Amino acid sequence: GKAYAEVRQALSDLNIDETYAEKLGLHLFKVGMPWPLEESKIIEFCSNMEEIIVFEEKRPLIEDQVKEIMFNQANRPQRIVGKRDEDNKDLMASTGELTPDFVSEVIAERITKTNKDEHILNKLRLIKQNEPDTAVIEGIANRTPYFCSGCPHNSSTKVPEGSKAMAGIGCHFMAAWMDRDTDLFTHMGAEGANWIGMSQFVEDDHIFQNIGDGTYTHSGILAIRAAVAAKVNITYKILFNDATAMTGGQPAEGVPTPAKISHQLFGEGIKRIAVVSDEPEKYGINTNFAEGTTINHRSEIDQVQKDLRTWPGVTVMIYDQTCATEKRRRRKRGLMEDPDKRSFINDLVCEGCGDCSKTSNCVSIEPLETKLGRKRKVNQSTCNKDFSCVDGFCPSFVTVQGATIKKRKVTPASDLPKNIFDKLPKPKEINLEKPFDIVVTGIGGTGVVTIGALIGMASHIENKGVSVLDQVGIAQKGGAVLSHIRVAESPKSIHSVKVGKTSADLILGCDMVVVTSSPVRELMNINTTQSIINDHETPVAGFVLDPDHSFGGKRIRQIIEKSSKETNFINAIKISTAMFGDSIASNMFITGYALQKGFIPVKPESMEEAIKLNNMAVDMNLSAFRW
């Protein structure tokens, strides 16, 4: 399992091969089935050993069995250590994860307790010297996950003045760290059940509870049923966004509709049900909702919620608006109409008050620094056409219909002369005597994972060993995304799929804010790490909440330079937007830049083949990569 891979990687990092292990008297046993252990093999391996070290994550399941099996054996080891050492001091934690760096240190320290091997002693000194600086740096931007541009939760999670809400499982949980009077959460399916108990001991006599349509279908209806039985005053806001957005955009099980949900809730005994939507006109006069259900436009959400909180018992608001990310996908695939309309901000009129951000809670409204101070602009590349930003009382907004964004005409890659790049020097080849470690960093939803997949496929095309590990989670919502890529001559050379501390050979920084985060800085080494950084100052979520938020770009650049052997800054977003009319090409552009510099161990031809195999926006990606 994973522990075995980390131990193998640790031994490789310590330069302990089979010959050297034999010299040290070091042996390795891989457990195939952790419970119950096969006793005869354990006895055979452990007998006459001086010390057994058990590496496992979480609780000591294997360690305890080994101790029990060997306890009465005549040839038992002198010591068996794992979670604790022979002095009963902590050795390995039962929380967190095992990493090759930690395992290397444990192995080196255990060996040198009894064997003063000079090679291992030197390695141990290097491990301790290379301990990265991971302290949180104050005064710079932080890439916190946030609602996507045009996300329905921007509107649906608002609560009227004087009320509070409780968070739930789903993207809407992020309301808990926004200015939304939203707090507390439970496990999936218990949303609101905590109010049954606490309502008897607080001054508030009512609360709102957010719950996604996927959670509702999965198990949330049980919590609603319990609230009805307990006769507590609570309004459930069922956030119907037509997709299980946090896990891939698939439809909820059973494919529920607002009308079906209203009937189910009415059958549970809930008499006050309201539907709120960004397009209520779609229902028509014959839509089959439960008796007494009211339908309102989202602009009336405040009045609707104020009414719902006055009713005794359980009330429900079904907020119906399609997930913004899913809308973008469907429009791209021709499955949903793309409104022939865009909103812009006239910076000559804008006074930079930030009311548009406050009204819409949208990350596509970005700062525009001018001679007259900070103003606002709409990022047309990320805008999902929700248009809630125009709801504020602002004369600077201009709505344009029947027009498209002017794009510079770029010659398709297929039409470029084949010899146009011949004068460029060939990228230098990288020695793969040991795995080459790349970390791609960027913002969720911008194609960071795709870059990792393409480099992985290019390596595969060249018959190299490669591993790709993506760390995403809720990061797809505008937060930090990391892709760990390890390329080697052979798959046998790769054990752990995660880049170790101070081991990154290349940081491909598609967003420089993410590069300065602790999880990335601990991978960097001032003696070996090359950094290719997109230094465009993409605004962070903090700007939505604070119109005077400082990005700290100069400090960020200094931190990256201080952590790298060599740093190359390039404004990939500015260049790609000018060339292609869309910033989405920036990640592919900076990848091509890094490869031309000789910092990616694959050939350009292999990357181009991988782009073609991916079969998504092939011409644009090829052009961005080549330029």
What function would you assign to each model-found segment?
Residues E68, N72-T247, P251-K260, D302-Q303, R408, D422-V439, ...:
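Thiamine diphosphate
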Residues D133-G150, I295-K306, R328-G354, S364-K385, ...:
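Ferredoxin-like iron-sulfur electron-transfer modules
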